[in-house]
């Protein structure tokens, strides 16, 4: 055996290995204590405000944590970086479906399949998710809400924009057939094994009962927090910027909160809960953690992963940084880091098949049919995030355009979209898009041949989804990959305690929701919303629990003032003056209350004036001028809602009906 400086090759290798292990231990040790170099002790901080529990992030998880902590007797400060009525994170904007199951063991098997081999999603974690999820309904009911199983039944008319026919639905693995012959819509209906779960729905979509076109779960949480105004103080426009960890005790004492522009040291005697969402709205973090350039996001603009930066500074481990929902196939908003949310998980741009996706070389790169699973598609038997170019184009003919979301009266997905091009020929369209003309002409010709043959020789697109691109004019629309929610953050245990690099909990620091989500592996619809409840409950209760090392209240620190606006329709109405036959009404939209003044001639609407609203301009467009005009023309509030802005439309309609009801007009429906 060859010798090196008196050592055999084997001795050298073993010695090098031991040195590497020792080096790794030193690195881990250094990482777990480096935070202390610049950290203060409790006596070195001038505390401005004191509470029992500080919750950072007023979304689904933060609201739940605050409520649970208050139920345990804690005085809670709940802070959010957004202005009031823009708080809520993705919980405010999502579809409000809540993943759940009826049987704990079945839930465990399902979560195990979804974890898909992620070792850090341990059996203990999977058992916790399975058991805590079944408690969500009781928690909602205990706080005055109504929780219901909401199976999404399919029919050809309702879901014609999702699938061309039942064969495509089955092939996309999104549906199971019930014994009564109906099809039920739920994601991953073949897991935890490969058999289609006909008449046996493992995962259910629940929801908080609310009127149609309302954000039931979010409205329930916001209303509940409002009702706790003697226990939960809320601050808006107040991002937490830094955690304060005592260098001697290792306890997280509180945080620096930029309260309306003023750095404020907040002492949390019992614990801090971070529920400030993950990073999908931060372009740099998306590129860093996904390795993808040019992606966009859909959802709250405030979800920029601030908590990730804060936990890293106090020695926390990170996990699930590359776990995201997406990319979805969406058009980008011009001049924005966001994408338009249109098509949901559809892998094509039109309701019919008269379209393809191409890149700058004019060539196709994917099978444009069916649906992805929150951006995941099977590669063999493994579900993985789709690989999409950073920029590509939907190419369609007039027939396809007529069935797309870009046709007819403009909906919100069209506004400002100077990246929609129209041409009389494919060659001309290619020039306008900046796509290789020869490549695109050949691609369209090949695709049309496949349609005639009933077989896609390039990507095996479902035959029932094939329809030719042949009737001009022709259209091209820019697309990109867009992420909806991410799961990265601090690693946590089943008690929602944040773990340091040494694997031990960081004292008094907890985490809930998408920030450091338990979801590793494959994501499923409603998974994060269900998690807001069970992780919020656990984090809030544990943060509020009595502790032997609870921090003493310092002299001079004040209790936080509550800045939330409690919704009081009568008070809002009373704050406006009315003339003869004028009546004020109010109702909820997605954001602040929508307030209107309605003029009546008997029971006939003759004028509608919108007095106050905070809906997103690029979503509602001309809603607040167009819809009132249509109401006056009809003499009634019962007019069609605006496509693409149904919740704001419903809020406006409800506000007008409220004004009419206050005038004594009997409103039906």
Which residues fall in each region the model found?
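Glycine-rich FAD pyrophosphate-binding loop
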Residues: 72-91
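N-terminal secretory signal peptides and thylakoid transit peptides that target proteins
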Residues: 2-20
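Active-site- and interface-proximal helix/loop "cap" or "latch" segments in soluble metabolic
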Residues: 566-669
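A glycine-rich dinucleotide-binding beta-alpha-beta segment and adjacent secondary-structure elements
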Residues: 242, 439-519, 610-613
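Conserved redox-cofactor binding core of oxidoreductases
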Residues: 131-262, 283-284, 331, 451-471
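An anion/pyrophosphate-binding glycine-rich loop and adjacent beta-alpha core
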Residues: 308-435
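Beta1/beta-strand and adjacent pyrophosphate-binding region of the FAD-binding site
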Residues: 45-59
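Glycine-rich loop(s) and the adjacent beta-strand/alpha-helix scaffold that form part
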Residues: 261-262, 267-335, 529, 535-538, ...
């Amino acid at each position: 055996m060859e010798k090196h400086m008196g050592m055999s090759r084997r001795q050298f290798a073993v010695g090098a290995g031991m040195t590497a292990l020792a080096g790794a231990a030193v690195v881990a040790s250094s990482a777990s204590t480096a935070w202390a170099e610049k950290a203060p002790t409790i006596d070195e901080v001038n505390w401005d405000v004191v509470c029992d529990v500080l919750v950072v992030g007023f979304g689904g998880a933060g609201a739940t944590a605050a409520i649970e902590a208050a139920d345990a007797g804690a005085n809670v400060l709940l802070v959010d970086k957004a202005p009031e009525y823009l708080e809520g994170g993705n919980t405010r904007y999502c579809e409000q479906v809540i993943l759940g199951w009826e049987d704990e063991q079945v839930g465990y098997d399902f979560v195990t399949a979804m974890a898909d081999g992620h070792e850090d999603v341990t059996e203990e974690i999977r058992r916790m998710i399975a058991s805590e999820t079944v408690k969500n309904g009781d928690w909602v009911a205990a706080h005055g809400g109504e929780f219901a199983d909401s199976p999404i039944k399919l029919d050809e008319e309702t879901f014609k924009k999702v699938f061309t026919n039942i064969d495509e639905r089955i092939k996309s693995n999104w549906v199971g057939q019930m014994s009564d012959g109906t099809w039920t819509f739920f994601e991953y209906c073949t897991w935890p094994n490969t058999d289609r779960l006909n008449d046996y729905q493992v995962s259910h979509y629940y929801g908080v009962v609310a009127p149609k076109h309302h954000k039931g779960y979010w409205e329930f949480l916001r209303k509940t927090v409002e009702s706790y105004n003697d226990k939960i103080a809320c601050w808006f426009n107040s991002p937490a910027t830094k955690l304060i960890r005592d260098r001697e005790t290792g306890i997280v004492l509180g945080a620096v909160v930029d309260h309306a522009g003023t750095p404020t040291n907040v002492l949390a005697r019992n614990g801090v809960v971070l529920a400030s969402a993950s990073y999908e709205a931060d372009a740099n973090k998306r590129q860093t953690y996904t390795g993808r350039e040019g992606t966009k996001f859909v959802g709250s603009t405030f979800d920029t992963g601030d908590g990730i930066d804060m936990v890293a500074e106090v020695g926390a481990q990170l996990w699930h940084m590359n776990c995201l929902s997406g990319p979805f196939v969406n058009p980008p908003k011009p001049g924005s880091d966001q994408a338009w949310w249109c098509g949901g998980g559809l892998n094509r741009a039109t309701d019919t098949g008269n379209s393809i996706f191409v890149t700058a070389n004019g060539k196709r790169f994917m099978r444009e049919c069916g649906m992805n699973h929150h951006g995941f598609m099977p590669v063999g038997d493994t579900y993985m995030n789709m690989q999409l170019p950073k920029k590509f184009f939907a190419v369609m003919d007039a027939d396809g355009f007529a069935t797309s979301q870009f046709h007819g009266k403009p909906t919100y997905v069209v506004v400002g979209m100077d990246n929609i091009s129209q041409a009389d020929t494919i060659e001309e369209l290619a020039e306008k898009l900046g796509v290789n003309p020869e490549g695109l002409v050949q691609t369209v010709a090949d695709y049309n041949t496949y349609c005639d043959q009933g077989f896609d020789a390039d990507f095996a697109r479902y035959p029932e989804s094939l329809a030719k691109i042949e009737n001009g004019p022709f259209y091209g629309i820019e697309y990109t990959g867009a992420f909806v929610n991410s799961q990265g953050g601090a690693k946590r245990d089943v008690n929602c305690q944040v773990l340091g690099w040494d694997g031990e909990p960081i004292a008094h620091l907890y985490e809930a929701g998408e920030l450091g989500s338990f979801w590793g592996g494959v994501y499923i619809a409603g998974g994060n919303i269900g998690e807001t409840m069970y992780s919020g409950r656990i984090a809030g209760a544990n943060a509020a629990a009595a502790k032997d090392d609870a921090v003493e209240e310092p002299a001079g620190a004040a209790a936080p003032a509550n800045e939330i606006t409690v919704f009081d329709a009568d008070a809002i109405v009373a704050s406006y003056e009315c003339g003869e036959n004028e009546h004020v009404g109010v109702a909820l939209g997605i954001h602040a209350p929508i307030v209107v003044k309605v003029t009546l001639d008997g029971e006939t609407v003759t004028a509608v004036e919108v007095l106050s609203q905070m809906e997103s301009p690029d979503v509602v467009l001309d809603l607040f001028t167009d819809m009132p005009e249509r109401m006056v023309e009809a003499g009634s509030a019962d007019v069609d809602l605006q496509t693409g802005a149904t919740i704001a439309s419903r809020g406006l309609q409800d506000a007008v009906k409220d004004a009419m009801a206050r005038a004594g007009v009997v409103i039906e429906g």
